[in-house]
Amino acid sequence: MSVSTSASKAKRLRFAPLAIATGVLGAVLLSVSMSGTLSGFVASITNSTNTAASGALTMQEQNSGATVTCSSTDGGTVSTNSATCATINKFGGSTTMIPGQTVTTPITIKNTGSVAANTFTLTPGTTCTQSANGSLNGTATDLCSKMTVVITNTTASTTVYSGTLAGLASGGAIALPVSAAGATTGFSFAVTLPSTVGNTYQGLAASLPLTWTFSS
């Protein structure tokens, strides 16, 4: 190996560490500049409470005097929110009506939830049922077509329905004014046994289920 070759090799070896050090320093500076850790101004906002929640729509029915109360949650919880109330008889429950007599029953429906009911309906069952009342029964078979009912919205002073029980059954759902959260609406049911019926209508009963519904 010549003297000049050895000197050149030695020179390269002396500059190699310096080149490596310079490269490492450059990489570090580049990394720092890209990460922004040398930035002097920083601003931030953290929204720690971001929530949304659903309301509840529930119904309460009461008789006159509020001695009997039925709620839509009586059938379980708000997850079910549907109940059957057999303790409020909107046709009065009289078993001794005579021709020409009217029995009136007032009730109230309240929106006990936290949201408004966008629709409010009263839906009769599809069939009015005639049955025997006691052991002495007439032979008539059309009591549902004779007995009448007038349903009045006493809060709005409007007639909801007026006609026979059979007609109510065949008429389908009846739309009622919407109910705000906490609002109470009064209704009355005036059931009449016509004065024109004779002995064949003695000892008979008519029944028809009615369903109140809120929806939002």
Give residue ranges: language-model regions.
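Long, small/polar-residue-biased beta-strand-and-loop interaction regions
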Residues: 2-216
